């Protein structure tokens, strides 16, 4: 409760001291102070002494009364000791004052008065100042006190006493003259004490002098090397500040106030500096003492009228900028640049850099002007300064926060652990962390097709989903063929809307073992067929439309083309006899009723919009992962399911019979299948084995054009495989580069159908009974008859027929069958073959060559210049084209997208080695089992479990042989960096990177020294990069470090520089292929001489394989280093760069899978390329004279050839002379040709040369040959 306070009117005279220096605003101070002080609280009335008039007359004293009164409000709740009282002060306009009620002797101490320092005050003219109702004032007391020192340093103290804690001390007023002073003040820490300096009588007011206040101890000296001193004239005692000197003179020097500081704390006593020995330089203005004249002259600047350098945080001003900077350091301690090599601190990074250069030789002298961090090189500083730039290209897709460095973004992403899966796919419900990963997933999503039928499709063509898309309907007879992509790679998103092929039914489709090798958005593709009314016809329309024959022949009925577009599409391909009647009747009717549907589908036959990113999908691409526009193989099963979806188009069978007759079109199931279809279901798929051989072999065809195929069709017969790879989706290959023959490009129309039963064979009639002939081909060209396989003939239809996987079977199937095989394989012998299903001969008179198709074929994006000069030789010189075909480097080694095949087939290869352990579940094979880096024909449960136990990345689907590899790879997605440097704040995802960082950065180890300039480097890659500069300076190749000379006199880079050679592969690619072409052209003209050279070269190759400088001898070291480099690039490089895309023979996958093969004992069945070279070394008499082997390895791995390929690139990078290049390229070409031959001959026994060279090649390519033996090619 507040109560009224009594007020008196003070006397006012005409002599108001308006100009009094102690009262600049008398009315404001007087009235407000009284009011506010009276508002604090209430107490009982205090007797007020006689009013004190203004000291304007000698008649009046502060103790005398005054006839005038002014209103003074006395607070009633001030806790004041009994020895004192509050009443009207004798100082005019000061308000209340403290008056003594008892006698006080000198030396008594009052206090403390707790205050809080402040940095600003209203007035700077007064030593003491009371300001009421100020915003900076303590809210409960309302008083701010400013204490100033005449040298310009001020300290402001706000009364911080709580209510009832001695706040009465603030009412001690300032005396008008020094004679009236009876108190002095001293500050200890944040407390103020009052000391009585002379006796105070009762009724006398307590006063201090205006110039005597609580002064801080000293000021900042102008220079750090000088100590300011002040000398007493009487006793020659030195003091640190003028305040100390004045106190000394007033209270201690002489008899005046000698006992002033007795009883006070030792801190209050001035510390004398002792008598100075020598002449002292004193400032006449401020009496400061300096040790030398120069210091005094520097000091005299401060006494000028105007100070140019003013502090923006306090009222201080300086004449020297250095003093201002030094002073500002006291305000902001964070702007200090400390030397890392000594204790000095600098305010400017340039001074720090200058200091390091002059005092610390070799230290990091490049300092950042923003943060002061130092770097050893200017490039390091430049890279660091990106942190302070405003450009932040790396944006978090979750919270959209941007960063200047990719590593910072990766580190930031770890903060989103709780929201990394907040973006949901609206179709399948799968969660994703970023929009880019969601967009990537939607291309493969299982929910529905996200791509409208445009571009390669006819406009407006509806895409009807297949009933097989339902994941809840797995086939009861699920086995390997139906275990598609997701069975082998359970976590890899299956390319849902990725088209396998955009060709009409004449084009084979990519089989389900390797879906989505080429994403649809990777390369632009023009429409393969122009939109026509035929393509725009509605689905399920019953028009007997005809597909325009691209071969220039009479148009075929669409039903004819479509019925054979997918082997197993119709029930006519049923495996059992009870379905044969439907093969003849109902199935053909279904096809007729869906003729327009098939015609539409023919334009996107292999658009496998397998929508499956569902990691739980178990049926894979073989069944439920068929595309929305693909066929549903179930709809054509022999059980008569309704045809609701669109058929799976692939290499079908051209029907024998009238081209316009739909009813006479019997559709046969091709024998070219690695897995016979089960009884319940016929799926239009083939195993991954067929896919890999067809894909790889067809890619090989791609690089040599149709020239060899024309010769093959005329003279050699068909290859042992059919071109089933969708080169319409290869990157823009021109028409002249298409590897398919005209017949191969029109599989569904041009390939002969095989009768499935005697009754089907009789339906063909005439010569077609022995050899069903294709009406779409011209009968003037005759193809040779392929030899019958050596295996046993097929048993009767009632018996169980083992799989026929021999090369001869593949060759026959490529002629007779379509490009599609059953998606379901046969595990336990339930597949029953008809008597006519054995091994029918192929009619030689029915296989003419067809004119080329005239579809729009894009051109390759990086191979165009290679084939500009080679195409002319292919048709005129078949043998030369054949050599050119196989002597070229394997496309898998260079095509960036082929690394996907390498990755997928590598994982499938391990299944081959397990076939010996699962013999109880596998039937004996009468022929040599075909196993080209693919799973065996049947997979038992342990095999399937082993396939699922692969360590698969859940983000990108990559598969790793060990969990450690997967763990390290996952850090590239999550950004996790668990290895932190103990010396700095950097962290790493790989421990080896941390060790290298500590070794190079902190330990300053530089073990790699350039022998040309003696410069040292911390990493081998830096040394290699440095050596390239010497190469440009025309340094001899033999002097380059990392380059070893082999037996041929050529050079190859050491493994440590292999990564740099990979980086230059793209630049050297054109020259590389150009040299190969030139070499092949020369070898064609000098066959006799090259035969001798190649014998010698092969021996040298065998010797060079043992050279310690080759990468094959140090693969483990290279693997570890490459892994580290790749991981580091994933973390710190710019986003979007991929190591695997720039270098086709990616070192990391190769090394990873080699480790996997080392772990699996069963993989020892695979005969590597090194073993091939050892075999050749045993027989030095011939180029490829190998000892007879009963069976060749089941896991032939072209990776071994890829490992050798880097030697050629290293040779190119070393810029060797042309002669040495020819030798090396010859060796590499022969190695790869040998690898290709082995890939096609696999289990064929190898003998010494005993037959003509052409016959050997014919045998390799599956053409007519008298012997099953494989012969070396010494004549090439």
Curated annotation (Swiss-Prot):
Residues 561-570, 1047-1058 have a biased composition (Polar residues). Disulfide bonds: none annotated. The keyword Lyase does not apply. Residues 679-1038 are annotated as: Interaction with CTBP1, CTBP2 and ZNF516. Signal peptide: none annotated. A zinc finger (C2H2-type) spans 230-253, 281-303, 309-331, 337-360, 366-388, 394-416, 423-445, 951-973, 979-1002, 1008-1032. It comes from the Eukaryota. One of its GO terms (biological process) is regulation of cellular respiration. It is linked to Left ventricular non-compaction 8: A form of left ventricular non-compaction, a cardiomyopathy due to myocardial morphogenesis arrest and characterized by a hypertrophic left ventricle, a severely thickened 2-layered myocardium, numerous prominent trabeculations, deep intertrabecular recesses, and poor systolic function. Clinical manifestations are variable. Some affected individuals experience no symptoms at all, others develop heart failure. In some cases, left ventricular non-compaction is associated with other congenital heart anomalies. LVNC8 is an autosomal dominant condition. This is Histone-lysine N-methyltransferase PRDM16. It comes from Homo sapiens (Human). The lineage of its organism: Eukaryota, Metazoa, Chordata, Craniata, Vertebrata.
